[in-house]
Regions:
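Extracytoplasmic/peripheral linker and loop segments enriched in polar/acidic and small residues
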Residues: 27, 349, 395, 400-410, ...
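Surface-exposed binding/hinge segments that line
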Residues: 31, 130-176, 188-201, 502
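N-terminal lobe/hinge region of extracytoplasmic solute-binding protein
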Residues: 39-89, 120, 190
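Gly/Pro-rich hinge or "lid" segments in bacterial periplasmic/extracellular proteins
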Residues: 162-236, 244-245, 354, 358
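Structural transition elements
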Residues: 195, 324-362, 378-381
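Ligand/substrate-recognition segments at binding pockets and active sites
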Residues: 242-243, 326, 357-429, 443, ...
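Periplasmic-binding protein-like
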Residues: 293, 297-337, 383-384, 481-489
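Long beta-strand-rich cores associated with HINT superfamily self-processing modules
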Residues: 497-524
Length: 524
């Protein structure tokens, strides 16, 4: 979920808006040719798109592979290899009709048999296979039609099918049959996307080249969906884990693009001639979990005192480092999504220290430290924890902060609940609110919080097919979270990347640099 860290700055916002409109309207490339050298925060552990949560696998996989469906600029479901689909009246059978004339990178046509093999492989080998556990069967009706039957209706099925990573990538049946998880050879890294793999040298580069036989969708470009044109001939994704090297290489011209840049360079790079800065939003929402089952915060009044007393503006500025790189927002879902809601907002960022201090006393606080765990891997998370700790001290709490690498922090959060009172985390965008079921449902064991009412709401929302009715259910979930206080959201963090001005048409989206529908003004 966090491995990308390994959506007043009007010029930036206007750049994104104009580039999006320009790219969406393109029927052909304004210019063809050239090379992009992109400095990435890390190297992909694999290019077998279905098997890894790693952001680097997604960032490169979306160029190579496509699915039946994907997500658009509003993070809603959009067709990709499927031109359309229908649903049976009982909501248990989905029939997908494939686009005609689509070819894999090896020149073979895409058939329903390839789709069946790919979906079945995902169900057997992907770490996200539980998301599609509602599937009962997958079968080819004919060469261009696939039928997927569900064991029970699920409103989340198609959105989860569209989720971009690990994605349900469609690959040639002949290349994936019998291949074990983690054993896909480089010669089998074959998809239908606008770029194909030319060479992968681990920890050195991933070289993608334009796929001349690519068959783009006819709809306007939006998010990962629509008409994706490969105007650049070659893309080199270069792992540059040292952030100072990414910045220096971008400024010197060694790199055309650099991702995941530090906030302290934002103003300078924005003002640098020949460069453009882009803000990625939404990116992550920063949250802290409160231990509702063990320790002092089992007492609701103490949790309420913390919720009541926090100054979220101060915490988010400390986390992001620049006012352009965050926003305050109370919703469990991002503003860019249909599911955004202000339910419970009256309990967000109240910043009432006097009432909070009174509740600390009334809640029977015994003076022992509130134990806060955070991650030293991610500066924003660490900085947020320190700013929040300072505020707790002002409210009358003693505190103790312990910083770990991210995997260790999550292990303590999940398995050693007697060892913490507050644990930090961050969530990226979910294409469907059903993605939060695992985080919130009592029987998942993800966090200490357990609520029969929330469990019932989540179960109803997973099968409710009316969108407005689902929204109301998730609003009730959000309302319960604000009342029960198992976690507190600080705000939305934005990402910050930069590129050279010779690249035109670029529009930020999600956490992935999109170089389709982008062209080089000098063709080099």
């Amino acid at each position: 979920m966090l491995r990308r860290l390994t959506t007043l700055v009007l010029p930036v916002i206007m750049l994104a808006a104009s580039a999006t409109a320009e790219a969406a309207a393109m029927d052909k490339c304004p210019a063809q040719g050239g090379t992009v050298r992109a400095a990435m925060a890390g190297s992909p552990p694999t290019l077998d798109f279905i098997t890894s949560f790693a952001a680097q696998a997604r960032d490169m996989g979306v160029y190579i592979y496509e699915g039946l469906v994907t997500v658009d600029g509003n993070y809603d479901v959009a067709p990709q290899l499927a031109e359309r689909w229908t649903t049976s009246t009982d909501g248990k059978t989905y029939t997908f009709h494939l686009r005609k004339g689509v070819k894999f990178h090896d020149g073979s046509p895409v058939t329903a048999a390839d789709v069946v093999a790919s979906v079945e492989r995902f169900r057997g080998q992907s770490p996200r296979k539980a998301d599609l556990s509602m599937i009962a069967s997958v079968q080819a009706v004919d060469e261009a039609t696939v039928e997927i039957a569900l064991a029970q209706p699920s409103a989340a099925f198609v959105p989860l099918l569209a989720y971009p990573g690990p994605a349900v990538a469609i690959m040639p049946k002949k290349l994936i049959d019998g291949v074990a998880a983690g054993k896909l050879p480089q010669t089998a890294v074959v998809g239908t996307g606008p770029y194909r793999l030319a060479e992968w040298v681990p920890d050195k580069h991933v070289h993608l080249e334009r796929f001349a036989q690519y068959s783009p969708a006819s709809a306007e470009a939006s998010g990962y969906a629509g008409r994706r044109l490969a105007c650049i001939d070659h893309i080199y994704f270069l792992p540059v884990p040292e952030v100072s090297s990414r910045v220096a290489g971008l400024e010197s011209g060694d790199y055309d693009y650099a991702q995941n840049l530090p906030a302290e360079t934002y103003k300078r790079l924005t003002a640098t001639k020949g460069l453009k800065t882009v803000i990625l939003k939404p990116y992550y929402e920063i949250v802290m979990h409160l231990n509702t089952q063990q320790g002092q915060l089992k007492e609701w009044k103490l949790r309420r005192a913390i919720q009541l007393g926090l100054n979220e503006e101060e915490i988010m500025l400390a986390a992001a480092g620049d006012k352009a790189l965050y926003r305050l927002d109370p919703s469990l879902f991002f503003k860019e999504q249909y599911w955004h809601s202000t339910i419970g907002a009256n309990r967000y960022n109240e910043h009432d220290a006097a009432k909070a201090k009174a509740l600390v006393k009334d809640g029977g606080y015994d003076g022992s430290p509130i134990r806060i765990i955070t991650s030293s891997d991610f500066q924003f998370m660490y900085n947020a924890a320190l700013a929040m700790e300072s505020q707790l001290r002002q409210l009358g709490f003693a505190t103790k902060v312990q910083a770990y690498d991210y995997p260790t922090m999550i292990d303590i959060f999940r398995k050693k609940r007697a060892d913490w009172d507050i644990s930090y985390n961050a969530f990226s965008i979910r294409t469907d609110p059903g993605g939060f079921t695992f985080v919130l449902k009592s029987d998942s064991g993800y966090q200490p919080y357990a609520s029969k009412e929330v469990d019932t709401l989540l179960e109803k929302a997973l099968v409710e097919r009316d969108r407005k009715a689902r929204l109301k259910l998730y609003e009730q979930v959000q309302d319960n979270l604000y009342k029960d206080i198992p976690m507190i959201k600080h705000g939305d963090l934005f990402g910050f990347d930069a590129l050279r001005e010779r690249l035109d048409g670029f529009a930020p989206y999600y956490t992935t640099p999109r170089f389709w529908n982008v062209w080089s003004k000098d063709k080099r």
